[in-house]
Amino acid sequence: MGEVWTWIISFLILITLLGLIVYQLISLADLEFDYINPYDSASRINFVVLPESILQGFLCVFYLVTGHWFMALLCVPYLYYNFHLYSRKQHLIDVTEIFNLLDWEKKKRLFKLAYIILTLFLTIFWLIYSTLDDYED
């Protein structure tokens, strides 16, 4: 039963990450269609960038602690990318450059979204597999 709880916790963390990334994409889309100004958009996105990175790091460590090596290895490139951005001070969006980098920022977040969705599908698969395996015992 502990294995099932591991996958449920992982599922909830991934849903939270998915929500944070979709929130960032919505803020960028609102800026693109001129519903909000650049300052508000940048402050909304910058507010959730660090929690996203911390949550992703926690998820990777969680997979390592629970012994799910494949899932931990799957999370390492995303974690490295977030760490790389943070160490070079490029993790936040600059208000003055947001219009110039709008397409690039959207592409980055769409890639992150696809990555999280892939990880989410694998987590759902392992959740179902673990549940059925516990049911047979």
From Swiss-Prot:
Gene Ontology terms describing biological process: vesicle-mediated transport
Membrane topology note: Multi-pass membrane protein
Broad class of where this protein is predominantly found: membrane
Subcellular compartments: Membrane
Keyword tags: Membrane, Transmembrane, Transmembrane helix
Keyword Transmembrane: yes
Transmembrane regions listed in the UniProt entry: 8-28, 54-74, 113-133
GO terms under cellular component: membrane
Top-rank taxon, per record: Eukaryota
Family the UniProt entry places it in: Belongs to the cornichon family.
Record protein name field: Protein cornichon homolog 3
Lineage: Eukaryota, Viridiplantae, Streptophyta, Embryophyta, Tracheophyta
